[in-house]
Amino acid sequence: MVATTLALAALQALAAGEAKNVIFFLGDGMGPVTVTASRIYKYGEAGQLTMETLPRTARIRTYTLDAQTPDSAPTMSAYMTGAKIRNEVLSMDANTVAKPPSADTSVTPSVGNAINNCPATGNGASVPTLLEQSIAKGKASGVVTTARLTHATPAATYAHICHRDAEYDIARQAVPGGAGFNPALDTGIDVLMGGISSYWRPYNAAVTPRGRPDGRDLVTELQAKGYTAVNDLASLNAASVSGRLIGLFDQALAQGHMSYELDRDPAKEPSLAQMTSKAIDILSKNPNGYFLMVEGGRIDHALHGTNAKRALADTISFDDAIKAALGKV
């Protein structure tokens, strides 16, 4: 996996030494070839993507403690924590060894990856993330993605666990006051938006066969903590910018991820730019500033599937989100 990352901060604040607001954009799987092809696809050879107009560009070498080819978990964790770790691990230290989850057979049919096998002690320690450090400074926080909210890239901002596939435990780390909550999030993340997945809903053999065997409804728990829950474009547009938001969008029905841009129904499912704009509107209410992570998560999925057109369209959608953000900061 190759990732190109753009971090946006007000240039005035940069000159002063510390940014009030930070928007961290991550195009998952989006390497130089994909960027070049997307530019030509949208604007022609002489055109420019919005991301290409930014004043600074850098390249990185990606490898982990145990592999030359990394996955999204240790790479995003490196961005968020500054720590080089092992493949599959999320925002833990170099002493952490990945231990995959196993199926929960207490229900029929069984639910894969529902049992977290990470030892409670003796397998490394968590490392603070940029999002957590921003919360500690009194800033608002947000996570927006076109992938599942519990997928490796978004999870690295708010969760600490020895294996990225333990998504049932990753989800509960985001729910304030509940069992398994990550206390470094204080009262919780202000904005959460991404593809829906069963990791947030209770198990039901007929309706949510991949739901939570522990029976918890994490969306209901978040609503009890003051979050507004939305699931389509209309409810997102109607949501107040004065409160907290959990958006889980299920139109794609594709492993919990949102639709590819080419397949998205613009009347029902929000674009990444629309989600980014809404997140900024909400987070901007905090006078101390905010930290927002925005992932174009399906670029990588299209490239894995050797589907060039979908990859290019999702890269352009990601670039549109950057343009939308620049229009608001």
Give residue spans per PLM region.
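Generic, well-ordered alpha-helical scaffold segments in large soluble proteins
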Residues: 278-282, 321-328
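N-terminal catalytic scaffold of extracellular/periplasmic and nuclease hydrolases
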Residues: 16-244, 251, 266, 315-319
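Secondary-structure transition/capping motifs at alpha-helix termini
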Residues: 16, 285-287, 325-329
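N-terminal signal peptide c-region/cleavage motif recognized by signal peptidases
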Residues: 10-12
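Active-site His/acidic residue clusters
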Residues: 152-159, 253-264, 288-289, 293-326
